[in-house]
Amino acid sequence: MNIRRLPVLLIAALLYATAVHQLKDVPRPSMVREMEVALPRFVQVALAGGDRYLAANLGGFRALVASTEHMQPDNFKIQGRVQRDVAWLNPAHEDNYYIAAAILPWNGEVDAAQDVLRQASAARLFDWQPIFYYAFDLYHFKRDPVAAAQWLLQASPRVTIQTDRYAIENVAARWFEKGYEPRVAVGVIEGMANQARDSGFKRYLQTRAERLRALEVLREAAARFQSRADRPLRDLQELVGAGLLRALPKDPFGFGYALDQQGQPILLNAPTRKPK
């Protein structure tokens, strides 16, 4: 062990013990254990013996092993902080930006994901994928297809395979022309699933794509309903009553679907609260 690091480690241990002692009496909801708290950045570096890259790897591993199936909005908020910290410690961390793109925006943490992806885009000048996911989030979550297409075109010079470059430029052109549509989101998520090495993570992404396909079915039926009835939907069950769907599609995550103020079907990202 490096003796010169001993005082740093002792201070880190003292800070950690103090933080745990203060936090144990603070009331908080029951949460998934992997994402209960985000430590200050200087504490993370101190606990890693002053090595910011080791601290980034520890934070990235923490995000990787988190059990997303049982996490609540507060957990995802903490995961967003953890992954932002990893990006600050090592903006070129590959696993961190990939996990951020695949999980955070789909669970209400779009800004956290964009922060991670923006830093990865600047640090990984050889890698087009952080720019692609950043552009996709602008398109799908922020619903700003023009800005998304402009970002996507920045990825094109980094692509080494000519056919892939053409494909990216074609997507950018479609975003400029068409705007928001769920089927584009399905294609991106399925592409990420095909690249995923972990089988559990692959299934998670495939389920996410299945959920988006169901949303597309609802939106197409809602458009036909509005064309026939000359008014927007007031309730999703009207699609069944009008004979446009035999039954409403089920959300594989169990959260369900709803209508926005314009009568457009949307995804719910948390269980609906039943009135007491």
Language-model segments: which ranges?
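Short coil turns that delineate tetratricopeptide repeat
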Residues: 91, 125-126, 159-163, 196-197
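Short coil/turn linking the two alpha-helices of tandem helical-hairpin repeats
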Residues: 64, 68-72, 101-109, 128, ...
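Low-complexity, acidic interaction segments enriched in glycine
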Residues: 106, 119-121, 181-187, 196-276
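Alpha-solenoid helical repeat scaffolds
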Residues: 98-99, 114-115, 128-135, 146-150, ...
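Structural signature of tandem alpha-helical TPR/SEL1-like repeats
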Residues: 75-78, 108-116, 143-151, 181-183
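Inward-facing hydrophobic residues that define packing positions of alpha-helical scaffold repeats
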Residues: 79, 83, 100, 117, ...
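Canonical positions in the second alpha-helix
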Residues: 85-86, 119-120, 154-158, 191-192
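N-terminal alpha-helical interaction modules that lie
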Residues: 1-94, 106-108, 272-275
